[in-house]
Structure formats: structure tokens, C-alpha cells
Amino acid sequence: MFFGKLGGFAFFLQRAVRCDGFIDNFFDRIPKFFQFMKSKFPSHQTSSSQADLLVSFSTSPGFLSFKDETKDTWYIQELYRVIIENAKDTHLADLLTETNRRVVEKYEADKVVFVCKQAPEFWSRFTKQLFFMSRNDVF
């Protein structure tokens, strides 16, 4: 009856009436050695105190995060591989999306009665793209 139909819904509701303040963007006052932390885009004078925040989880709340017996967790294994393979030219949000895809498609935990999968998640309030740079690019 509902096969092939939309699998989810999004509701946009106002959660509060509180106004977010702002913070100074202090990158211009940071010594040159640490300038590599700046984004590729020019900075603004002020920013929301809630902006430029990223949180990543190995799984959704209430679900198990799996680990190989001899290696690290599935999420950390794939995050490491994705960063090593793609960090030079891919921004962080896309690296995390690729990590999520790999964990969901690649891994299964063999339980006695059923097979378990894992789905990482992250949320981002980035206002800019964040790229990793090699040491050669910094110095």
C-alpha cells in the first residue's frame, strides 16, 4: 500500500522564543601559526553563539555501537579511512556523510537470532566549509 512512498516527515516548529546572542570572531587576533584553523571563506565580525558547531555520534541515541574484537569501533575505523583517503579536498560534513554511508552499507553484527546494523549520525551548524590541511600547507 505504501511501498515506494516517502519514508519520513519533517516538521519545522518554533522550539522557543529565546533570542540567541552573538560572539566575536577572534580569528584575526590569533597568531599566524594557528591561522590554518581558519575556514576557506572570509570571517564575519560576529557570529551566533550556536553557529559553527558540529556533533557526531557513532550511532543514534538508544542504539548499540559495535566494535570488532581486534580492531576499533566500526565508526572510528571508517572515519579514519575516509579522512585519510579524502581529507585533502573534501570538507568535514561530506567526510562524515561518507563515513555514515560506509558504516551503514558495510558492517553487520552477527547476533544469534537477528543481524544488527549501525547507523551513525551527526548534526552540523556550520556556516562555512571546514577543510583539513597537510603540514606542508601550513608551514
Curated annotation (Swiss-Prot):
GO CC annotation, single: cytoplasm
The entry's keywords: Cytoplasm
One Gene Ontology MF term: cysteine-type endopeptidase inhibitor activity
Lineage: superkingdom: Eukaryota
SUPFAM superfamilies, per the entry: Caspase-like
Compartment(s) where it occurs, according to its Swiss-Prot or TrEMBL record: Cytoplasm
Pfam families hit by this protein: Peptidase_C14 (PF00656)
Keyword Repeat (UniProt): no
InterPro entries tied to this protein: Caspase-like_dom_sf, Caspase-related_regulators, Pept_C14_caspase, Pept_C14_p10, Pept_C14A
Reported consequences of knocking out the gene: Hatching is impaired in 5-6 percent of mutant embryos and about 2 percent of adults have uncoordinated movement. In the anterior pharynx of L4 larvae, several cells including muscle and neuronal cells that normally survive during development are missing. Slight increase in the number of cell corpses during embryonic development. In a ced-5 n1812 or ced-6 n2095 mutant background, where cell corpse engulfment is defective, the number of cell corpses during embryonic development and in L1 larvae is further increased.
GO terms of biological process kind: negative regulation of apoptotic process; negative regulation of apoptotic process involved in development; positive regulation of apoptotic process involved in development; proteolysis
Family the UniProt entry places it in: Belongs to the peptidase C14A family.
Known role: Non-catalytic caspase homolog which does not contain the region necessary for caspase activity. Acts as an inhibitor of caspase ced-3 zymogen autoactivation and delays ced-4-induced ced-3 processing. Has no effect on active ced-3. Probably by preventing ced-3 activation, protects cells, whose fate is to live, from apoptosis during embryonic and larval development.
Self-association and partners: Interacts with ced-3 (via large subunit p17); the interaction prevents ced-3 autoactivation.
Listed name of the protein: Non-catalytic caspase homolog csp-3
Primary gene name: csp-3
